[in-house]
Amino acid sequence: MAWKGEVLANNEAGQVTSIIYNPGDVITIVAAGWASYGPTQKWGPQGDREHPDQGLICHDAFCGALVMKIGNSGTIPVNTGLFRWVAPNNVQGAITLIYNDVPGTYGNNSGSFSVNIGKDQS
């Protein structure tokens, strides 16, 4: 099973994918592209390591990084990708990809990340 799509930096709700993660599933995610969290230079999916955390949705990733939620989980850093990754056993649901920024400040963001997700059963 696979999913391919765009994650817009100005979409605060994130991009829901067609991938449903079940405990034990093995996924690989690859991300590329350029996006900006305001009138600044653009960054890749790893985000801007120099920007301070001023209330980001994911405190474990840099501002402008690609992160995800699985079902009702907390945010999980993705950055440029994850290879053959397995989530904790209590995580289950649809994968939503999100640009890491401060809630309520997405309106001045621009750009996007192209993302591919592959899923294998463990």
Curated annotation (Swiss-Prot):
Gene Ontology terms, MF aspect: carbohydrate binding
Protein task: D-galactose specific lectin. Binds in decreasing order of affinity: melibiose, methyl-alpha-D-galactoside, D-galactose, methyl-beta-D-galactoside, N-acetyl-D-galactosamine. Similar to plant lectins in its selective (carbohydrate-specific) hemagglutinating activity.
Source organism of this protein record: Pseudomonas aeruginosa (strain ATCC 15692 / DSM 22644 / CIP 104116 / JCM 14847 / LMG 12228 / 1C / PRS 101 / PAO1)
Pfam families xrefs: PA-IL
Superkingdom of this protein's organism: Bacteria
Subcellular location(s) per record: Cytoplasm; Periplasm; Cell surface
GO cellular component, one term: periplasmic space
Lineage: Bacteria, Pseudomonadati, Pseudomonadota, Gammaproteobacteria, Pseudomonadales
Protein name: PA-I galactophilic lectin
Keywords: Cytoplasm, Lectin, Periplasm
GO biological process, one term: heterophilic cell-cell adhesion via plasma membrane cell adhesion molecules
Family: Belongs to the LecA/PllA lectin family.
Alphabetical list of InterPro entries matching this protein: Galactose-bd-like_sf, PA-IL
